[in-house]
Amino acid sequence: MPTASMTPNPFLSGSPEHAAAAGPLAAFAALPTGMQLAFAIVLGLVVGSFLNVVVHRLPIMMKRAWLAEIAEATGAPCADDSLPARYNLCVPRSACPHCGHALRAWENVPVLSYIALRGRCRHCRTPIGARYPLIELASGALAAGALALFGPSGAALAAFGLCAALLAMSAIDMQTGFLPDSLTLPLLWAGLCVNLWGTFASLRAAVIGAIAGYLFLWCILWLFKLLRGIEGIGYGDLKLLAALGAWLGWEALPQVVLIAAVAGAAVGLVATWRGRMRFEEPLPFGPFLAAGGAATLFFGTPFYLLLGG
């Protein structure tokens, strides 16, 4: 819960009383509710389109950096020279990953372009993964949810930023099995900065949450390693739970972990029962932590309280 402070909270300044200080946010707050919601959905769709770029390119960029470091250390030529010299989240233009056809502007329109193209590349007719419209739609829904919960305020923007990062990290974890430090660590620091004003938790609770989140899964990791001889959880998951603790405070961590554990176990059992995976096969835990964090952000801690927490 946000705590009272003598310093005005810039993340909660969407009300008319703060209109003079809110700048563009005040103009947005003055719009009819329907227009606010429509704008939030469009913003979410656009951000979702960019998240697809992050999900596709960031693992490639990291792999390229690793190969370059190996080549530098060993003196061998870089093993991957198939990409352009400049390859990042901004350049080159988006292209079909199969044929390399550069996408036109209208082919980048979120969701609608997927429908217009009937889910296939216009050039090579290779099917486009359903992940692209799903991430865009999820991002739009999360933006609308943040606006509905927090109103036209900086808190809504911060909440949507958290959800967008969780969405991208979940997709990357499902695709590659790892959570990039370039996303988890900035998310942790962002949570501490946002809670300087007690936006989602007091700063004290946020700092304790970051420490407790990391140490809790660290203990689980080493306990599993002592009992089974293997690491049952990745270090990226430790950093993600620390980031969620920094955003939501230590009080929210039991519910986040509970939701993640129950959802992960349920999905794992169903996937094993249907033959989609072997019992001993690892299941990425990041998406379930992200789901627990998002559920706690939007709904508070009623599930934990119902269980007697």
UniProtKB/Swiss-Prot annotation:
This is Prepilin leader peptidase/N-methyltransferase. Its EC number is 3.4.23.43, 2.1.1.-. Keywords: Cell inner membrane, Cell membrane, Hydrolase, Membrane, Metal-binding, Methyltransferase, Multifunctional enzyme, Protease, S-adenosyl-L-methionine, Transferase, Transmembrane, Transmembrane helix, Zinc. It catalyses: Typically cleaves a -Gly-|-Phe- bond to release an N-terminal, basic peptide of 5-8 residues from type IV prepilin, and then N-methylates the new N-terminal amino group, the methyl donor being S-adenosyl-L-methionine. Plays an essential role in type IV pili and type II pseudopili formation by proteolytically removing the leader sequence from substrate proteins and subsequently monomethylating the alpha-amino group of the newly exposed N-terminal phenylalanine. Zn(2+) binds at residues 96, 99, 121, 124. The lineage of its organism: Bacteria, Pseudomonadati, Pseudomonadota, Betaproteobacteria, Burkholderiales. It is a multi-pass membrane protein. It comes from the Bacteria. GO terms for biological process: methylation; signal peptide processing. The gene is gspO. One of its GO terms (molecular function) is methyltransferase activity. It is found in: Cell inner membrane. The chain crosses the membrane at residues 35-55, 147-167, 183-203, 207-227, 230-250, 253-273, 288-308. Zinc is required for the N-terminal methylation of the mature pilin, but not for signal peptide cleavage. Belongs to the peptidase A24 family. Its cofactor is Zn(2+). GO terms for cellular component: plasma membrane.
